From Swiss-Prot:
UniProt topology in membrane: Single-pass type II membrane protein
A GO-annotated cellular component: plasma membrane
Organism: Cellvibrio japonicus (strain Ueda107)
Region (Disordered): 1-53
Protein's name according to its UniProt entry: Cell division protein FtsQ
Gene of this entry: ftsQ
Disulphide linkage map: none
Length: 319
């Protein structure tokens, strides 16, 4: 056995070099990348401020900090007072300027323009300040033929008076009904001679006017003009046409009955209309005709009725 001991080679131990270790660590680690910013979001610093060039904000001195806008009222009121004082006298002279002309406008059928001018001249003073416009309007509208009045001042010295007359639709008692169904009393009733005559209770005036307009529209296309319409206390209707033919309608279904009459008129009555004196449409499924006495249609009807009666009498009877 060899007495020689095993020889262990020397091992060189070196102290760790911090630079080398740092280099090794750096080579193995992946570089850190900044977080990706989504579109639409601004990059901010940890303090919450935007990145970029910042300019220091320098507070500007406020030279108007002492100013209070309410102070403007003082010089404004002073200016208005001074201006009003100097303008009062010229304005007063302008307002007191006397009229040089009065213009009367409107369509005149029942009241003459001369009559309107006369009513106006009685109310006009020498200047605008003393003119009572409301009293002038009342004076004009008190005339039953005047519906409305409009007054306008046309500077510097002209008064424009616009007058709208009443529009009579039908006669009613000692006056007429206007387009609103109002009863207007007038003295010159003869000036309404060409209008239809409506009769009934005053409380039913609007309804009667509406019924007249509906019936007139239905009959006018066939040359049948309504000259009178009456509604009695039982609300029974009766009308008179231009050739003095009276039609008894009754209390209910007025338009339905008259439409049935129009149908019969178109098919049977049109050709013998001059021989008809009266018609009764109060039946549920027809109408009755009263002929003018002695007319050809009346004679023909009487002959036909007599023949029918004789045929009935001579007909054989069966046991």
């Amino acid at each position: 056995m060899d007495s020689r001991e095993d020889m262990v080679p020397d091992v060189l131990l070196e102290a760790p070099n911090p630079r080398r270790r740092q280099s090794a660590d750096t080579s193995t680690e992946r570089p850190t990348r900044p977080a990706r910013r989504e579109q639409g979001y601004a990059r901010v610093t940890p303090r919450g401020e935007r990145m970029g060039n910042h300019k220091a904000r320098v507070a500007k001195p406020d030279f108007f900090a002492w100013f209070d806008p309410r102070w403007l009222w003082v010089p404004l009121m002073v200016c208005l007072a001074v201006g009003g004082y100097w303008a009062y006298e010229p304005l007063e002279k302008l307002l007191e300027r006397p009229f040089k002309s009065v213009v009367v406008e409107g369509e005149f059928h029942f009241i003459t323009k001369a009559r309107a001018t006369e009513l106006i001249s009685d109310e006009i003073d020498n200047n605008f300040l003393q003119l009572d416009l409301m009293r002038l309007k009342r004076t004009l509208t008190d005339d039953p033929w005047v519906d409305s009045v409009s007054l306008q001042r046309r500077w510097p010295d002209t008064l424009v008076v616009k007058i709208a007359e009443q529009k009579p639709i039908a006669r009613w008692g000692d006056g007429f009904l206007n387009q609103r169904g109002q009863i207007v009393r007038v003295k010159e009733i003869d000036r309404l001679s060409g209008l239809p005559w409506l009769q009934g209770n005053e409380s039913d005036a609007v309804e009667i006017l509406q019924q007249y307009q509906d019936l007139s529209q239905l009959l006018r296309s066939r040359g049948l003009d309504v000259i009178a319409l009456k509604c009695d206390n039982k609300k029974s209707w009766r009308l008179t046409l231009k050739n003095d033919v009276e039609i008894a309608i009754g209390r209910d279904k007025v338009m339905e009955k008259m439409r049935r009459f129009v149908t019969v008129y178109d098919t049977h009555l049109n050709s013998v209309w001059i021989d008809i004196a009266a018609i009764d449409v109060r039946y549920s499924n027809g109408l009755a005709v009263r002929w003018v006495e002695g007319s050809e249609s009346a004679k023909k009807y009487l002959r036909a009725a007599a023949a029918t009666t004789n045929a009935t009498r001579n007909a054989p009877t069966h046991p």
